[in-house]
Amino acid sequence: MGAELGIYKSCVSARSTDKEILKHAQDGGIVTSLFGFALDEGIIDGAIVAATKEFAHKHPAKAMMDNSNMEFHEPWRPIPCIVNTKAELLAAAGTKYNISPNVSLIKEATRSFGLDKVGIVGTPCQMQAVRKLQLYPVGARDVGSSIALAVGIFCMENFPYQSILQLVEDHAAMKMESVKKMEIGKGKFWVYGKRGQIVQLPLKVTHKYEQPGCHVCLDYVANLGDISTGSVGSPDGWSTVFVRSKIGDSVWAKAMAAGCFETQPIEKVKPGLELVTKLANEKISKNKKTLEERATFGVGKALRNPYI
């Protein structure tokens, strides 16, 4: 495939062999299983993940927030948290379709939490931030070397919390506290209620709610992760996995040897890499137009002297 999929050593369709993880996971349970294995093997001693109010309430010492206002914290607003056990990973599992500032917890993870080997999961832009922090550790000396495993997730765009609130409560007519799961797939935004109700919204409804910063991003598949993963390209209940770096290759090989995953050749599943490539190119083409438009705004040009 072309440059739109980034550099990778291997690509497969995979899912966790742990049935408990699959009950909690969004798709194939890749991130939860990887971090669980990495914790067990001492590859990492903690991971930064996006959790929710319920997790932070149960594990207040693990959350990056002011716990004095916990009762006012909105349901489904992601909270960056540190996890150190499989039980905590399971409690935090699942995709949250709004912005979670996971990278902002890295420095705190190595200092206040005393972690020497940190795992982090994030969107493509967050993987870029992690690599920049490693290359240019301004104000974060010695932090970059503590990042032991970075797992990226596919992302077309993300949403501010208020946008998700509008989509769920106004368009899907469901209260946020009654939502069990949200997902994007098959051209729809899906909202699943705790009482079994399912609402699907056409993606065209969601576009005006997208985070504006997402419209200048040219990375769909988290090119800079050690491993990147997402549901697109694989059958329901499975995930597409790109193994990208030496670190990622080593961890993935060990996890496979330990029986953590079952895999299928990506060439033998439908819709396969053809759909991943199509969406990656669509994101690049669409957002390049935004970049070209912004180039005409005059940003970066010398300011005219207002007194002349």
List the predicted regions and their residue ranges.
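Iron-sulfur-associated redox domains of electron-transfer enzymes in respiratory
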Residues: 1-308
